[in-house]
Amino acid sequence: MDFVALDVETANSDPKSICQIGVAVFKNGDLIETWSSLINPQSHFDFMNSAIHGITEEDIRDAPTITDIKSKLDQRVGENVAAIYSGFDKVALEKNFPQINYSWLDITKVVRRTWEGVAYSGYGLANVCKLNDIEIGRHHDALADAVAAGKVLICALNAKKLKLDDCRSLIRRKISTLIAHGKMSENPNPVNIVIEGGNPDGEWFGDVLCFTGELRMPRVEASIKASQ
C-alpha cells in the first residue's frame, strides 16, 4: 500500500496561486516521510483565503516559487499513486505544470463508495477524520491535511478489504450501485432537504446535481423530479 498524499493551499480563488504544499509518503500503509513548503504564488492574497489557512503575504515573502520546488515534489511522488482529497489539488498543480503526469487518485471518490453515511454529503476531510477517529492536526495546513487524507485512504481500503490497485475499478462504479437509498428523509428541513432514492433507470441516477438561479418550481420539487 504505497502512495503519496498531496495537499495544497492557495492565496486566492485562482487554483494556480499555490502558497503551501504538503506531502505525506506512505509505504506498506505506514507514514514514512513528510515534507512541506510555503510557496510564493507571485499573486495577491485574498482575505478569505488567509482567514482559512492563516498564510499571509509576509509569510511567503522569501519562499520559493512552485517551479523552484517541482524537483523536490517529483522526487517524492516518483511512480507512486498521487492521492488527493478532491480534485482541487490536481487542478492547482496542473495549472502550474500542464505536462504533469502523476498517477492521480481522488480519495473522496473512494470515501463516498465506502461509508454510506457520507456517500452523498458530509464527506469533507474534517468530518471523515472525525468519523474514523483520525487526528487531523491543524485543518487547512497543507501537511496536516495531506497526512490526514492518507490515513483516511488507508481506513477506507481496510474497511472495504481492498488493495490500492483495486481503487480504480471501485471509483468507476456509480455510488448508487454500492450505496442503497430508498425514500425521502422523514420530516426533512425544507432548507436542507435530502432526496434519497430515485429511479435506477433515470438519466441522472447516481449523479450529483446542482440547481443554480431561479427555477419555475420549488427546489424540493425539482429535486424529486430529477431523481425520477
Where are these regions (language model features)?
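DNA strand-break repair and replication-stress modules
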Residues: 162-228
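Acidic, Mg2+-coordinating catalytic module of metal-dependent nucleases/exonucleases
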Residues: 81-87, 91-92, 96, 124-186
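Short, structured loop/turn "capping" segments at alpha-beta junctions
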Residues: 103-105, 121, 160-165, 202
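Short alpha-helix plus adjacent loop in nuclease-associated cores
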Residues: 105-126
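Conserved non-catalytic scaffold segment of RNase H-like nuclease domains
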Residues: 1-103, 122-140
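Short coil/turn segments
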Residues: 42, 114-118, 215
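Short, glycine/acidic-enriched loop or turn micro-motifs at the edges of active sites
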Residues: 10-12, 109, 148
